[in-house]
Swiss-Prot record:
InterPro entries: Herpes_UL21. This is Tegument protein UL21 homolog. It comes from Varicella-zoster virus (strain Dumas). Disulfide bonds: none annotated. It is found in: Virion tegument; Host cytoplasm; Host nucleus. May participate in DNA packaging/capsid maturation events. Promotes efficient incorporation of tegument proteins UL46, UL49, and US3 homologs into virions. May also play a role in capsid transport to the trans-Golgi network (TGN). Pfam families: Herpes_UL21. Belongs to the alphaherpesvirinae UL21 protein family. GO terms for cellular component: host cell cytoplasm; host cell nucleus; viral tegument. Interacts (via C-terminus) with UL16. The keyword Magnesium does not apply. Keywords: Host cytoplasm, Host nucleus, Virion, Virion tegument.
Length: 541
């Protein structure tokens, strides 16, 4: 489900997305999109996922969320029935006792801390589950709601396939905005001039084309309405005119125009497996990576579903490596001459080889389709031996670097590190990913997050890991960082860890390597599902 927008404005700390004539604004709240009009008396609408049950016609998940809201003292947030329990109600459960709708604004991420609710949604009673409902694709000026939220374990980075019966993508005509949201949007349109229709000077609410997949089109027009109340002059309030449904026929809001597109492929679907993991096939995928992913036009024989998948893969490449390849990642020491797309393919191969979440099978299908479309006189057996050696070296070094930083983090948790008078500055990226590595390391060695740890000790661990990440990301070998840590600790443990991991092979799964893959998956998907949302500092364009 896609919502095009023309400009963005940061107002009261929240990003608002305006349509072309600035007659309507969208904002994100608890994984849902809320649309408000400039025109007095216009329609307010909410677009997003509602929770259902574990099978067709079942509403057990919705009932559970409503009962938990009542139990935790958030009766004011309980929806009137089981048909309109939106994802933002789920977000409220993990947002703290005093949380209101205003606290949920600005992100498509919804935290699920309740293992019972997680069991309903992904069939596993996990904690620290995050549901990613959509993404802001800034380079296309589009907000996208996924057909089904993506479920990620924030502790280890694992992705789960949610129960599709648990979610439906719908829209609802809102009768009012909650009080906290009324305060948020008050005065929003005052600083943004309306652009009138140049042909007839009309200031009517323009149509917004909302693009949905065929699956979503079946449910997106589900419309929740309530009884009539008197009309008032207060915008966005509970006295907003309420429109009674006059028949069983579902009608859309007057600003909505639905356009249907083919269903977008889930490139991370674990049921879609690669047909081979031979190095020669990998080399072919790496060789054609940029043409396959970045080529603007479809080539003959490319299926629509695969063509749509290219856009999703491109977005993931940008999330991991940046628009111009400016974001560092593992494997840089040997992969300097490879493009971001080529290094991305290698990462997907490693994840696929170790049966973690990946999109290598889709890349394989795209490569096969592209090669089949080449002229018959083209020499497709053109992968140089130097490139094959570079691919092998990059894959092995990438897994070894990830393995070393992971085992180092696990070891540092039990070592008494000397305190430093001051800390050198490390990059924001290394700090953020250092925290993620340490969180996963604690889980790996059986340390609970509830065990109290001195803040200075935690900061010390985070500093060492983030500093070492900066060293690796700059292209320095693991060995140099291990030697520095040996001097710092007065111990040979870091160099011993280095020699334990240096023999790892990315092409032959082994027991210790599975722990390394957990770290790789956590860091990779941490970027894929966070970077596209930006840094929250958007300004009007």
């Amino acid at each position: 489900m896609e919502f095009p927008y023309h400009s963005t404005v940061s107002y009261n700390g929240v990003t608002f997305y305006f349509n072309e004539r600035a007659t309507r604004a969208y904002f994100i709240c608890g994984g849902c999109l809320i649309s408000i009009p400039r025109k007095h008396g216009g329609e307010i609408a909410k677009f997003g996922h509602v929770v259902r049950g574990v099978g067709p016609g079942d509403r057990s998940v919705a009932s559970y969320v409503r009962s938990e809201l009542n139990r935790t003292g958030k009766t004011w947030a309980v929806s009137s029935n089981n048909n309109c329990v939106f994802l933002d109600r789920v977000a409220l459960l993990a947002a703290g006792s005093g949380a209101v709708d205003r606290d949920l604004c600005g992100t498509f991420d919804v935290e699920v801390e309740d293992p019972t609710l997680a069991d309903y949604l992904v069939s596993l009673p996990v904690t620290h589950l995050t549901l990613v409902a959509g993404v802001d694709v800034t380079r296309e000026n589009k907000l996208k709601l996924f057909p089904t939220p993506t479920a990620i374990n924030t502790t280890n980075g694992f992705m789960y396939v949610p129960n599709e019966a648990s979610f439906s993508l719908v829209y609802m005509r809102m009768l009012e905005l909650p009080e906290s949201l009324q305060e948020l949007v008050s005065g929003l349109f005052d600083g943004t001039p309306e652009i009138r229709d140049a042909l007839n000077g009309s200031n009517d609410d323009e149509k917004t084309s909302i693009i949905v997949s065929r699956r979503a089109a079946d449910v997106v027009t589900e419309d929740v309405k309530a009884d009539d109340v008197p009309i008032s002059g207060e915008p966005y309030s509970e006295k907003q005119p309420r429109r009674r449904k006059k028949s069983d026929h579902i009608t859309l809001s007057n600003f909505v125009q639905i356009r249907t597109i083919p269903r977008v492929m889930d490139i991370w679907d674990p049921r879609h497996k690669a047909t081979t993991h031979c190095i020669r096939a990998l080399s072919c995928a790496v060789f054609f990576a940029d043409e396959v992913i970045f080529k603007a036009r479809k080539w003959p024989g490319l299926e629509d579903e695969l063509n749509e998948a290219r856009e999703t893969i491109y977005t993931a490449v940008v999330a991991v490596y940046g628009e111009r390849g400016e974001l560092p990642f593992f494997g840089h020491a040997y992969g300097r001459d490879l493009t971001s797309c080529q290094r991305f393919v290698i990462v997907q191969y490693i994840l696929s080889r170790w049966e973690a979440f990946n999109c290598y099978a889709v890349i394989e299908d795209l490569t096969r389709s592209y090669v089949n479309a080449l002229p018959s006189d083209d020499d497709t057996d053109q992968v140089a031996q130097d490139l094959i050696r570079t691919i092998v070296d990059t894959a092995n070094s990438l897994l070894r670097e990830v393995g070393f930083i992971g085992t180092l983090a696990e070891t540092l948790l039990f070592l008494p590190l000397p305190q430093l008078p001051c800390y050198k500055e490390t990059s924001h990226l290394a700090k953020k990913e250092g925290v993620r590595i340490l969180r996963l390391a604690k889980t790996g060695v059986g340390l609970s997050d509830t065990v109290p740890v001195d803040v200075s000790v935690t900061e010390r661990h985070e500093y060492e890991i983030s500093r070492y990440l900066d060293t690796l990301y700059s292209g320095d070998p693991c060995y140099n960082g291990a030697v520095r840590l040996c001097r710092l600790l007065g111990s040979s443990i870091p160099i011993a860890l280095y020699y334990n991991t240096i023999s790892g092979n990315a092409f032959e799964p082994y027991f210790a390597g599975r722990r390394y893959i957990a770290y790789l998956g956590a860091l990779f998907f941490g970027r894929v599902h966070q970077t596209p949302f930006g840094d929250g500092k958007k300004t009007q364009r």
